[in-house]
Structures are given as structure tokens and as C-alpha cells.
Amino acid sequence: MHELYQPREIEAAAQTFWDEQKSFEVSEQPGKDTFYCLSMFPYPSGKLHMGHVRNYTIGDVISRYQRMLGKNVLQPLGWDAFGMPAENAAIDNNVAPAKWTYENIAYMKNQLKSLGLAVDWSREVTTCKPDYYRWEQWLFTRLFEKGVIYRKNGTVNWDPVDQTVLANEQVIDGRGWRSGALIEKREIPMYYFKITAYADELLESLDELPGWPEQVKTMQRNWIGRSRGMEVQFPYDQASIGEAGALKVFTTRPDTLMGATYVAVAAEHPLATLAAQGNPGLQAFIDECKGGSVAEADVATQEKKGQPTSLFVEHPLTGEKLPVWVANYVLMHYGDGAVMAVPAHDERDFEFATHYGLPIKPVVRTSAGDQTPAPWQPAYGEHGELINSGEFTGLNFQAAFDAIEAALVKKSLGQSRTQFRLRDWGISRQRYWGCPIPIVHCDTCGDVPVPEDQLPVVLPEDVVPDGAGSPLARMPEFYECSCPKCGAPAKRETDTMDTFVESSWYYARYASPHYEGGLVEPNAANHWLPVDQYIGGIEHAILHLLYARFFHKLMRDEGLVTSNEPFKNLLTQGMVNAETYFRMETSGKKTWINPADVTLERDAKAKVISAKLTSDGLPVEIGGTEKMSKSKKNGIDPQTMIDQYGADTCRLFMMFASPPDMSLEWSDSGVEGSHRFLRRVWRLAQAHVAQGASTGLDIAALTDDQKTIRRSIHQAIRQASQDIGQNQKFNTAVAQVMTLMNVLEKAPQVTPQDRALLQEGLETVTLLLAPITPHISHELWTQLGHNEPVIDAGWPAFDANALVQDSLQLVIQVNGKLRGHIEMPASASREEVEAAARINENVLRFTDGLTIRKVIVVPGKLVNIVAS
């Protein structure tokens, strides 16, 4: 055993062993407990960042621990390889996205391997390869034929210069992020998944996920947004509208119906179109609204604007004429594109009515009273007793809901309804680097799904996009085809799928990645699924996790899987943060500086008091701790850390610095501390091994001091098992090992029993560290005399007898102040402890002249004598 810890050699040897032995390749083993551990697969952006390292290390620790429990563990990895960054890189570098993507995958795979992950690479999937997306297209055609996927016009952000659709986040101040062109709203045909058909189940089956963070479930509940309310019809005023009919609105507050003073419609609503005829001012306002963002969050925060129309509707219960306004805060795709406005009890309506001088009529008595003077108060939105509401005055919320519903139903002008905030999922993208949509457009037959024997529709990989529109729409060799039904000339769909589709089912494909008979091989899928532990960032709480849950239910209903949910347990790891430094330019712009280029001055307590740029010695501003990012230049290259310290040090620091679900603050000194600790472990083991093999431990012959050392060993096992296995608090498990190391380093090594005890201690340290620092553990286990690799060793079990103490040292207090200690047999009764405390010489001294009023015994810990 080499005298010095040499991580480069140790890690290379361990990784070579695992590769040659195919240590992490698994197959279905009926009758053996399985554990499927999965970290969200990466986008092949080019290089790993510290967020990746943390994510995959957490997954690896869990996987290796479960393997040591004797389970058949699957931990696969692959690549979420379609998407916009590849197109942008292709445009910038004049290279095909496929080439860029595959080169990045090769580089990042080597980086991941250098971390020593216990991954079954034989199951690697790459979503941009036809053998993967072929099955996505197959499922698409099945769902299209069932009506779960349909085509309709949708409103999108259209960039007239680039001739392409932009996501909401690509529209900056109303302009395209790349071209700078003013964005238009445009209606184009798009494909949609009917996720709303599963809204109830997606909501209710959240209750079947006790292993998910409550925060994530709450976010999904809010996103699905089920609300019970009423559909209310406001009859048209025929004199102004010119025809019979009714304006439909949905409200969750029918109790406030008597306080409605106007109605507001979205810019796209038919009444808005009607009112704009011959009204250029209104038409201009409608065009302005249509040019705004289609994102709900943006609508919520923008200034509330509106225009009156000459149209009126009638109040369904009073017949009063209410004016129709066009307002920018009403969304056409939510509800019916119209709202009944009750300014006294709704903040948006209040803001709007105050601005435009519209009536505000309070109809609910709230904790703020019967009036609603400006400014808006949250109390105005409370439920309460009705006032100013005619026959409904005096009713509470539920009674008013029921009575007003009955009155509306009687007049055929309303009914109760459950509504969802969730919208159907539009998946059409006018992009090149995505999965082709397997539909053929035929003038005679309409939209025809591509037959199974003609799948996959292969995306040509030699295309270099220029950023202007969809390249596929300019490639007759791609879109010209024959109709699968009638054989006539037809046109292939040139839109590609949203890349969230690929990541919605990849976890299932890992169960049988090479299966050519279907999307999954049913036996394998049902053997491994659902995933036992899923790990990823909280930023995926809604879209990805909701879409994956939806897809799992689609696959279940297609008979592909039998479970209802894809992921039993979810761990959302925290971010990796680091210090930021910048200089403020005269323009007011911040120029960010890499921490590696900064020299710090610290005070006696190691607090940073000033920072200078190393190259010029001039001051820089300290920006505080923020998430590692390219823009702030505070990222640390994992490869540099691995090259300098080794993967085990990086893994140990990541696990020790913070609980996995909390943010982790990067610290160079923390990394160095982790490295020093591994050197200590190596040094102690090397010194022990150098003395030759130790004899077996004779537990019955242990001295009291040796029993104390052995107790520390088994306390560490008990606590670390609880920390890793039950609480996923890897940081406290590492702390237990560090505490044990302190004991072992001080332990005598004189007798054979001493050396046998140290052997047990070092084996325990090795096993407890094995999931976290697998390379050094692999080498130590061999050096400690074991033939089988540490990955096949079982997780240690604590010896309950070792934890039993023959005697206990108890604290003695007089009136709450420490006055000494007494040694007592562990079996001593309360009375014996009290008697021993009373005759302790310190107690006698501090109670001299006082009367002992009470003796409080806390078993195993302390005795407090109350005297006065």
C-alpha cells in the first residue's frame, strides 16, 4: 500500500476494475428486491457544471447504498439531446446540430465516468437518435387516432423577420430575442395533447405520492388549478348587439353576482370583434392587446388597460344593463374569454374600475366593513355575509352560492361547473432540431398518421439552420411524400415536437432500451417501474414532472405499464452557489469577474473584508453568494477540481457541505478540508496495514477502554444508517465518520486486541464511506484483506450489545449549575442514583446550610438538586 494518498492512480484503477467487470450492468432478477434510482438526464451542453456533479453524486450515493443493502439496483444515464441550444450553437458556429450534440455527448460522458458513477451505460439513451424517437412517433400516432392528440389553431408569438414562433421567454419587451423585430400574435395550426382529460386524476393521484416534497405537490395542484364555480350567462342587450344570445362567464364567486357592474372580454372575443367594426380606436387597442404576451404571469403583472364598447349585456337576475369593455387582463384561453367584473371584491376589477371611473358596489360584509374605499385591501376579497343583494342579503358564502345557483338554473342562465387552470399541451414547434411529427397532410384524406411500418420519420442530420424559419419547411426532399391512405401526392408535417415530450417517457425506455418490438418491453417495464427514487432540480416541479406523470397515465392506458405514477420518491436537490465579484462600469453596467482572478483580504475571523483583481491590484465589489452561472462568471469547472483533488474529494465535499435538498455554498477551503480528511483515512489505514494482518477480535476480552472505542464504531454505524437510509442527510452521515476517525486516530495500537479493534474500525469507515467516496473505499477494502470488492460487501449492521454501557457518567447540578460528575452502573435505579448524588462531596459543599427541596433525575444524563 503506497504511503501517500494518490487519488489519480486509485480512481483510475477502480474505474478500470468496474468497467472490466461490468459491475453496474444489471438484468431483471425475479425474486430479488429491485431499486431503480434515476437522476434527471442532462442536456449535452458541452461541459458538466457543478449542478450536474451534485445531482449525479446524490443519485450515485443512494444507488450504491441500496446495492449494499443487497438490492438489484438500476441506475441508468442518457441524453436529453434535442432542443434550441443546439440550433443556436449551429447558427453561431456554422455546424450541424447533430455533430455539435454528438461531440458534446462524447466529452460529457467521459466527464461523468471520471466521477465514478455506478451507472449501467449499456442502457444509455440519446433522444435525438431515430431508435429512440421512433417510439415517440409510434405513440403519437396511437394517441392521434384515439383523439388524445388533436390539431387546432393556437395563438403564438410570431417573429416576422426570422419567420418563426417564439416561446414567451424569447420575447423581450415585445421584440424577438434574436432579430429584435416587433412580435406579432398569430393563429397557426398546432398539435395538442389533451392533458385536461386527465386533470382530475393528475390532481387526485398526488395524494398517492407521500415520498414527494409537499412544496412540489402544492405547485402542481396550483398549476392544475381546479376551481368549483358557476357558469353564468348574461343575455345580450339586443338593441346594442343586434342579435339574441348570451355572454358566458365562469366565476368562483357567484355570491358576488349582485355586485357586478360591468363585463370585460378578451381582445380575441367575438363581441370585441363586433364592437370594433367602424371603431378604429377600439381596433387599434385590440391589435395592441394581441401583440402582448400570451403568458399568464405577464398578464397578471402588466398595467390593466381597457376600452369601452357601445355594447351592453343584461344582468341575469336584475335585468340591469351592464357595459361591455375590452380589457387586456382577460385571457381568451382561460374560461370563456370573458369575466363578470365585481370591483368591490376582486383586486384586478377594483384597479380597473378605479382607473376608468366605473361603479364599485360592495355586496359582502368583510372584516374591513361594508364599504370598500381605495386603496384595495386584501380583506375586500374575503367571504362573508351578503349585503346590498336583494333577496340574498344576509346569506353566507355557501348559502348564497346555492341560492344564486338555484335562481340562475330556474331561468336557464347558469349552472355549477368545475374548471381547471390547466390548458391542453401544445407541442408543435417550428424548429428543426426536434422529433418530427408523424403526420401527412393530404388534400383528400386530411391529416393522416404515418403507418407503423413507415416509422420512424427520420430527421435529416446534415442540416445547418440559419435561424430564419423552419429548415424542414424549405426542404422538399423531406416534406414531399405520398398519402399513406390514398397514395396521392401529399405533404409531410414540418413542425417538430416540444422537447418536453422526449423527457416525459425516457425513464420507461431505460427498462428495455434496445427492445425493437415496442416502446417498452412490458415485463422489463413492470419489473423496474415505477422509479423508486427520482432526483432533480425544483425548477422542474411543474412542467417536466407534470408531463411525465401525464405520459405515464397515457402509457398505462395503452397497456404498456401497470403502475399509475412514474416516480415513487422525489428528491429536489438544492442549487450550488458561489461568491460573485464585479466592477461597476461608468455606464452603470456590471462587469462580472471570475473568483479565481480575485485576491481576498480576510480579518482574524476569516471574514472577507476586501477584494482585488489579482492582475491589476485594484478593488472589485463583492456581489454576494449566487447560483453558479456563466453570466455571473462564478462557476467552478468540475474537471479542474477532479484533476486537482480527485473525484472522491469532490463527491465528499458535495455530500458534506449541505443536506441534499438545501443550497450548497462552494468553498475552496471546504474542498481542501475534504481532501485532508481522505488523506487522514489513507494514512491511518496505511500505517495499520504496514504492521501486517491482525488477529480476530475477542469481544468477551475487551477492556473498558476498548469497549468505549467499539461503542463509537457501532454508534457511527447506527447513526449513519439512519442518516443515509431514512433521512437522506448525507452530510450528517459524513460527520459521523469524521467523529469515528477522531476516536480511531487516538486509539492505542499496542496489543493484538487493539489492532483487531482498529481493523474493525477501519473496515467500518471504509464501508460507511463506500457510497460517497467509492474509489478510495475500493482500494482500502482490498488492502484491509478482503477478496470481494467493496461494492459487493454488505452495508454494516450495528451490534446492539456494543452500544450497551456497563457504567454511565452523569452530570450533577445544584440549582441548575454544574457541580461535578458521578460514575454509576448503567443498571442503577433512580433511588441509587439520587443517593449517590446526595453524598457527592461537591453536592455536600454547595448545599451546606441549605435544605434540599427536590432531586430531579434525568435517566442516563444528569441529576439536578434543588436546594434553598
Curated annotation (Swiss-Prot):
A motif ('KMSKS' region) lies at residues 627-631. One of its GO terms (biological process) is leucyl-tRNA aminoacylation. The keyword Signal does not apply. It is an enzyme of class 6 (ligase). InterPro entries: aa-tRNA-synth_I_CS, aa-tRNA-synth_Ia, Leu-tRNA-ligase, Leu_tRNA-synth_edit, M/V/L/I-tRNA-synth_anticd-bd, Methionyl/Leucyl_tRNA_Synth, Rossmann-like_a/b/a_fold, tRNAsynth_Ia_anticodon-bd. GO terms for molecular function: aminoacyl-tRNA deacylase activity; ATP binding; leucine-tRNA ligase activity. Keywords: Aminoacyl-tRNA synthetase, ATP-binding, Cytoplasm, Ligase, Nucleotide-binding, Protein biosynthesis. It is found in: Cytoplasm. A motif ('HIGH' region) lies at residues 42-52. Its EC number is 6.1.1.4. PROSITE patterns: AA_TRNA_LIGASE_I (PS00178). Disulfide bonds: none annotated. This is Leucine--tRNA ligase.
